[in-house]
Amino acid sequence: MAEGEDVGWWRSWLQQSYQAVKEKSSEALEFMKRDLTEFTQVVQHDTACTIAATASVVKEKLATEGSSGATEKMKKGLSDFLGVISDTFAPSPDKTIDCDVITLMGTPSGTAEPYDGTKARLYSLQSDPATYCNEPDGPPELFDAWLSQFCLEEKKGEISELLVGSPSIRALYTKMVPAAVSHSEFWHRYFYKVHQLEQEQARRDALKQRAEQSISEEPGWEEEEEELMGISPISPKEAKVPVAKISTFPEGEPGPQSPCEENLVTSVEPPAEVTPSESSESISLVTQIANPATAPEARVLPKDLSQKLLEASLEEQGLAVDVGETGPSPPIHSKPLTPAGHTGGPEPRPPARVETLREEAPTDLRVFELNSDSGKSTPSNNGKKGSSTDISEDWEKDFDLDMTEEEVQMALSKVDASGELEDVEWEDWE
């Protein structure tokens, strides 16, 4: 009996153990199933969220790209429109062909054509909103007068062409009519602006034609100026050049400075009858540079001739004229002397009074001493101390006076017969 109880206890313990293991295993299995289910749900949820987030990001990116493309298109269209306006006012260099002078400009429709100022102004007028919104420029009377002669019905065909061919006019018309202006006001203002533009262009063409005509008819001013320069009179500076006289002083010596060294001139009339011969008996006069335009200076030649003839005649008679170095010399009255070789002849009459002629510049005083034996004249300097033998050779080279006794007597007789001139007449000579 005892063995049967032991077997029963072991059997019950095994059953209890098995039952306990079975329960624990089932609980563990349930936990595992529940964990797997939860893990699967979490994974599925996370995957779905990730997929949804990725899809939304992709959709947003695609939407952004699409909107940016539309923006780019709008920006491109606006830039093209503004480029047309800028090219209308100032064509860019890249639209200019380096072939002759052909400039291309952009039109509102997007094409290019040779540049024309009138068309450029017309395109600018068409794309300007002020053309249609503001009142026309100028006096209202002119606009009313033009409006009375304008018929909008006649412009229907042109209006249709403008709306079809000009995007700028079409856009402005759609935006402004009838919100801002009426249909008639829109087109009245536009066509009046075009009318003013045509008038302005007509004035430009008229001015251009007149300028070209004046240039074609303009005489050759340069040729006329050259002709006038060729026949122009002598300038005042050239006309007032004083008579240049050869100085009797050697080079390096200053000229006379005191008033006593002025020229002594006898008041006689110009000996028009006394003409020097063309042979060896000729008189070499002082070279003078005279201007033919000055009449008073042209008389210097006969005055010098008469002076030299009288001085020669005085020296032939042995006259010695003394001139002091200080103070003006008084009029000299000399006594006639009988020349050598003519002691028995009649005594000649006393010569005329010698007077002082004031000139602008002091000149040298020289008296010719006529040697009756040799027939040659030797100059003597009475305005300087000492004799003039040191410069007589130079004067003989410059002045060669050969006169016969008969010519000297004839000159003296004419001098005595002419009489004495007054001081006023000598001033007139100057």
UniProtKB/Swiss-Prot annotation:
The lineage of its organism: Eukaryota, Metazoa, Chordata, Craniata, Vertebrata. The keyword Cell cycle does not apply. SMART domains: BSD. It comes from Homo sapiens (Human). Keywords: Phosphoprotein. The modification Phosphoserine is found at residues 92, 166, 387-388, 418. Residues 247-298, 319-398 are annotated as: Disordered. It comes from the Eukaryota. Residues 146-198 form the BSD domain. Residues 276-291, 371-390 have a biased composition (Polar residues). Residues 350-367 have a biased composition (Basic and acidic residues). The modification Phosphothreonine is found at residue 356. GO terms for cellular component: cytoplasm. This is BSD domain-containing protein 1. The keyword Phosphoprotein applies.
